[in-house]
From Swiss-Prot:
Principal subcellular localisation of the protein: cytoplasm
Record field: compositional bias (Low complexity): 273-307, 444-467
Entry GO terms, CC: anchoring junction; cell cortex; cell projection; phagocytic cup; plasma membrane; podosome
Protein species of origin: Rattus norvegicus (Rat)
Lineage of origin: Eukaryota, Metazoa, Chordata, Craniata, Vertebrata
Entry membrane topology: Peripheral membrane protein
Start and end residues of each stretch annotated as Disordered: 271-507
Tissue: Detected in spleen, mast cells and macrophages (at protein level).
Name of the protein described by the UniProt record: Bridging integrator 2
Gene Ontology MF terms: phospholipid binding
Length: 507
C-alpha cells in the first residue's frame, strides 16, 4: 500500500517536471524566434487594466489603514487631554459637572467614529482588494496553459511534418493538443468576461467607500461641534467668574503667530458654507487685530489718494500757471495806469506851485550829496503829518512786482525766476521827461516863494522826510529790489531836486 502511494507520487512529480521542462523549452524557442507565440490583444488590454486597478486598490487600502491608525491615535490623544482637563478643573469653578458630561460624550463619539470607519470603509476596501489575488492566480494559470497549448501545437506540427510518420505518436499528439486547447480557451474566455467587470467595479467601490466616509465624518463633526460649543460655553462661564485674571499671550502681534488668535466655534447652520474665523469679543487680542486691519485699510486709502493726487497735480499746476500769468498781466496794466495818474497829478501840482513855466535854461551841475542831505533835513519838519501818512501808504501799497507764487517742484525754479524778471520789465512805467528845474541864472523869485513852494508841495516834503538816506543808498536799494519800486524812487529824486533848486534860487 505504501509502495503504491510512493510510486504514484513519484509519477506525479515526474509528470510535473516534464511539464516544466517542456514549458521552459517552448519559451526559449519563442524568444529565439523558432516558434510562434499565440497572442490575444483583447486579453492583454484587460490584463493591463487589471494590474493598474490592483496597484491603485492596494494604494488606497494602505492609505485608509493609515487614516484609521491616525484616528485611533487622535482618539487616544483627545481622551488623555479631556481626562487631564477634568483632573485640573477645580470643583468650585463654574461648569464642573458639565465638563464631566462633555468629556464622557467626547470619548464615546470618538469610539463610535473609529468603529464605523473601520467597518464601513476599511473592511469594504479590504474585500475589494482581496479578490485581486485570485484573479492574479488565474491570469498566471492562463499564461501557463497558453505555453502548454503552444507546445502541443508545435509538437503536433513536428510529428505531422516528420519524414517517418508514426500513427500512434500522431494520435497522441493530437489528443494532447486538443486537451491543451480546451483548457486554455475555457480559462481565457472566463478571464475575458470577468476582467472588464472587475475593472468597472472599482467605480462602485470608490463611491461606496467615500460615501460612507463622508457620512461618518459629517455625523462625527456635527456632534463634535455641539460638544465644542458646550465646552466653549463652560470656558466662557469660567472667564466671567474670574474676569480679573487675564492671560496675555506674548508676541501675539508678530506676523508669524497669527494662529494664536482665539476664535469661537463655527455655527452649525453655516457648516456647509465657507466661514471666516470670528475673533472672540472677550479675547484680549481682538483690539490688536482690529487695529491692524484698520491700519491696513488706512494705508490702502493713502496709497489710492496719492495715486489720484499725482494725476491731478499736473493739471492743477498748468491751470495755476495760466491764472498766474493772467493775474500778472492784469496787475502790470493796472499799475501802469496808476503810475500815469500819479505822474499827471505831480505835474499839475508842480505847475500850480511854481507858477508859469520858465524858459529852459542850461542844466546846472548836480548838487553835492551833502547839499541834498541838508535840503532833505530842512524839508523834513515842514509837513510831519503828510510824511507820516506817506510812509504808511507806502507800506500798505505793495509794489506790483512782489506777487508771491507758490513754490512748485525744484525743476521749475529757473523758469519761475525768468518769468518774474520778464514781468518786472513789462510792469515798469514808461519813460517820461524830467520835471522842470530852476537855474541859478533864471528869473529871481521872492524870498517867500520857497516857503510857498514847500507849503504847496506836500508830496515832495513827505518824500524827502520818508527817505532821508543819500542817493547812493537809494540807488543800491533800487538795484537790489524788484522792478516795480523804480517809479517811487524816481518821483522822490525829482522832488528832492526841485526843493534843492528852490533853495539855490532863494540864496
Amino acid at each position: 500500500m505504501a509502495e503504491g502511494k510512493a510510486g504514484g507520487a513519484a509519477g506525479l512529480f515526474a509528470k510535473q517536471m516534464q511539464k516544466k521542462f517542456s514549458r521552459a523549452q517552448e519559451k526559449v524557442l519563442q524568444k529565439l524566434g523558432k516558434t510562434v507565440e499565440t497572442k490575444d490583444e483583447r486579453f492583454e488590454q484587460s490584463a493591463s487594466n487589471f494590474y493598474q486597478q490592483q496597484a491603485e486598490g492596494h494604494r488606497l487600502y494602505k492609505d485608509l489603514k493609515n487614516f484609521l491608525s491616525a484616528v485611533k491615535v487622535m482618539r487616544e490623544s483627545s481622551k488623555r487631554v479631556s481626562e487631564t482637563l477634568q483632573e485640573i478643573y477645580n470643583s468650585d469653578w463654574d461648569g464642573h459637572e458639565d465638563l464631566k458630561a462633555i468629556v464622557g460624550n467626547n470619548d464615546l463619539l470618538w469610539e463610535d467614529y473609529e468603529e464605523k470607519l473601520a467597518d464601513q470603509a476599511l473592511r469594504t476596501m479590504e474585500n475589494y482588494v482581496s479578490q485581486f489575488s485570485e484573479v492574479k492566480e488565474r491570469i498566471a494559470k492562463r499564461g501557463r496553459k497558453l505555453v502548454d497549448y503552444d507546445s502541443a501545437r508545435h509538437h503536433l506540427e513536428a510529428v505531422q511534418n516528420a519524414k517517418k510518420k508514426d500513427e500512434a505518436k500522431m494520435a497522441k499528439a493530437e489528443e494532447d493538443f486538443s486537451k491543451a486547447q480546451v483548457v486554455f480557451e475555457d480559462l481565457n474566455q472566463e478571464l475575458l468576461e470577468e476582467l472588464p467587470v472587475l475593472y468597472n467595479s472599482r467605480i462602485g467601490c470608490y463611491v461606496t467607500v467615500f460615501q460612507n466616509i463622508s457620512n461618518l465624518r459629517d455625523v462625527f463633526y456635527r456632534e463634535m461641534s455641539k460638544l465644542n460649543h458646550s465646552l466653549y460655553e463652560v470656558m466662557s462661564k469660567l472667564e466671567k467668574q474670574h474676569s480679573n485674571k487675564v492671560f496675555v499671550v506674548k508676541g501675539l502681534s508678530s506676523s508669524s503667530r497669527r494662529s494664536l488668535v482665539i476664535s469661537p466655534p463655527v455655527q452649525t447652520c453655516t457648516a456647509f458654507s465657507p466661514v471666516s474665523p470670528v475673533t472672540s469679543p472677550t479675547s484680549p487680542n481682538a483690539l490688536s487685530v482690529t487695529s491692524e486691519s484698520e491700519s491696513v485699510s488706512a494705508t490702502a486709502e493713502e496709497l489710492t489718494s496719492e495715486a489720484v493726487g499725482e494725476d491731478s497735480c499736473e493739471s492743477e499746476e498748468s491751470l495755476k500757471d495760466e491764472e498766474a500769468d493772467e493775474d500778472q498781466s492784469e496787475t502790470s496794466s493796472s499799475e501802469e495806469e496808476e503810475d500815469e495818474d500819479e505822474d499827471e497829478d505831480e505835474e499839475e501840482s508842480l505847475a500850480a506851485c511854481n507858477g508859469p513855466t520858465p524858459t529852459p535854461a542850461p542844466t546846472p551841475a548836480p548838487a553835492s550829496p551833502a547839499a541834498e542831505v541838508k535840503s532833505q533835513e530842512e524839508a523834513a519838519p515842514c509837513s510831519p503829518t503828510s510824511s507820516l501818512g506817506r510812509g504808511q501808504t507806502g507800506k500798505e501799497h505793495s509794489p506790483p512786482g512782489e506777487v508771491v507764487l507758490r513754490a512748485r517742484a525744484s525743476s521749475e525754479g529757473a523758469e519761475q525766476s525768468k518769468r518774474t524778471a520778464s514781468v518786472q520789465r513789462t510792469s515798469a512805467p514808461p519813460s517820461r521827461p524830467p520835471p522842470p528845474k530852476a537855474s541859478g541864472g533864471g528869473l529871481s523869485s521872492p524870498p517867500g516863494s520857497a516857503e510857498a513852494s514847500k507849503a504847496c508841495h506836500p508830496r515832495a516834503s513827505s518824500d524827502a522826510s520818508s527817505d532821508p538816506e543819500p542817493p547812493e543808498t537809494g540807488e543800491k536799494e533800487g538795484t537790489g529790489s524788484s522792478g516795480p519800486k523804480e517809479p517811487h524812487a524816481s518821483s522822490t529824486k525829482s522832488a528832492t531836486q526841485v526843493v534843492s533848486n528852490d533853495e539855490n534860487t532863494e540864496l
